[in-house]
């Protein structure tokens, strides 16, 4: 009887972990969020020269302050908070290009 009870308790404790495990699509969602942020930043910080997307991204991400603001924007996207999203992007400093 104790075995069955312990097995039931163990199952009930482990089940939420299985339910809340990361979806196989979570990395795709993160990539989509990143692309959305970079697209919106490109509208705000238009490079004057012919920079590749990768080089432009590295220039934007070179500043620790910009990295923090972009993290804030990602959190705002996850929480579906447009006001905080645009507020965070507005704090990003456009590098000289």
From Swiss-Prot:
Organism classification: Bacteria, Pseudomonadati, Pseudomonadota, Gammaproteobacteria, Enterobacterales
Gene name in the database record: yicS
NCBIfam families cross-referenced by the UniProt entry: YicS_fam
Protein name: Uncharacterized protein YicS
Organism of derivation: Salmonella typhimurium (strain LT2 / SGSC1412 / ATCC 700720)
InterPro entries for the chain: YicS_fam
């Amino acid at each position: 009887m104790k075995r069955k009870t312990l097995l039931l308790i163990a199952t009930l404790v482990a089940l939420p972990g299985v339910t809340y495990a990361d979806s196989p699509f979570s990395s795709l969602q993160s990539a989509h969020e990143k692309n959305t942020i970079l697209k919106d930043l490109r509208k705000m910080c238009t490079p004057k020269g012919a920079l590749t997307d990768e080089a432009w991204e590295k220039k934007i991400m070179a500043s620790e302050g910009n990295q923090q603001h972009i993290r804030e924007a990602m959190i705002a996207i996850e929480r579906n908070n447009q006001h905080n999203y645009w507020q965070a992007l507005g704090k990003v400093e456009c590098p000289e290009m």
